[in-house]
Amino acid sequence: MENRFGNKIIYQLAPRTFTPQGTLKAAQKLLPHLKETGFDVVYLTPIFLADDDTDRSFWSARLKKSGAENPKNPYRMKDYYEIDEEYGTKEDLKAFVAAAHSLGLSVLLDLVYFHCGPKAAFLEEHPDFVRRNEAGGFALGEWGYPVLNFDNPALREYLWKNMEYFVLEFGVDGYRCDVGQLVPDDFWVEGIRRIRRINPDILMLNEGYVVDLTAGESENGVFDANYNFSWCNRLIEAMDGRADAEALRAQWFKDRDYYRGLTGKCARMIDSHDLATDLPTRNELAWGSRGVECALVINHTIDGVPFVFNGYEVASTCAACMFASRLSKGENAIEWSNLLLPEGKYRLAWMKRLNELHHRQEPIWKGSLRFPETTRERELFAFVREYEGKRLLTVANVSAQPVCAEVSIESAGMKELLAAGAAYRQEGPALCLTIGPKGYLVLAD
């Protein structure tokens, strides 16, 4: 089955971080910027009514640690059918989706169906919509929130109607499913089949790794892409200097086996609302501009669906904590003023080139992948994508040292598409190159 994401690039938009106002109206004004930069799918973190319960016994450890002192965790739902006034109104969401569609952008909303807030709107009428402990209280999940009871057919119907509602009434193009592997498989199969009867082109992104539910794997294959935490973590380790290129290759082969060859349906990321909240230092500060660009080049040219967290296109270093907002402590909006500075101007132009490269080069999203031999296997992460006789070569030095090496490939006739810190020439059957720390080279026929 063809991948519905095709050559699309996902942009994760967290409203609290995306603009100082933190609203859908403010975000809508910047949609032309996303289109011009070359993004295709706008994934909105939850904008539904969040639980404002101040009982800290129902606050996650992460929320307490953040210091935001904000009970409204966007991933702790109070009402799945209402828009939180922090972000705007239902009319604002309709206008946002319509504006996105006018630009050719798709919009995904975030479904948080594993748990809910302790004051969820349905609890008074349907106390059996959540699991209970032996004492009759809430059964709490990993993050300390009441866990939904999928043994209850009425809950399933309530949530299936919720999925249909935002497709029918707002025209959204699909969903990202929070911790999707913790929700029963058969719930997703039925729910996604229902919304695809409304719109056959619905896009579904699973924040999980249920291989049997991946499109193309079985008759129950309903998710078009999965998160791949193992790859994300290994690439971060490589950029941090805690892993090398050999570890990256080993991880790719491990993932290929686990995903049964469907690694092309893995979201490729180096950051997200979770990572930005939890990691001690933003990648832009930890790796520098060259390191970030090296990692993005790898993820945009290897098999999979590129996934970019908001702000990377302007080299933002803001804290981006998901719990902080203009209404709480720790406001942290993207520094759009970077676009007045050389580093921001450069990154935006560079991101446009990278996104265009991904869109235009069919070997990236249709082709096979192999790893050519190099004389510096620990430092160089090199791979070839090939489709219908056309090749694309990516070489990235993931080490902190300059490297002189050979890559076993005949590169005569290949053109340079993107490069930084790399000098190269063809000598016989090998590409000889000198490449600086976190340098990269992309060539194509």
Indicate where each model-derived feature is located:
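C-terminal beta-strand-rich structural cap/linker in extracellular carbohydrate-active enzymes
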Residues: 427-445
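Short amphipathic alpha-helices and their capping/turn segments at secondary-structure boundaries
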Residues: 27-40, 97-101, 253-259, 295-302
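Hydrophobic faces of well-ordered beta-strands that scaffold small-molecule active sites
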Residues: 9-11, 42-44, 107-109, 175, ...
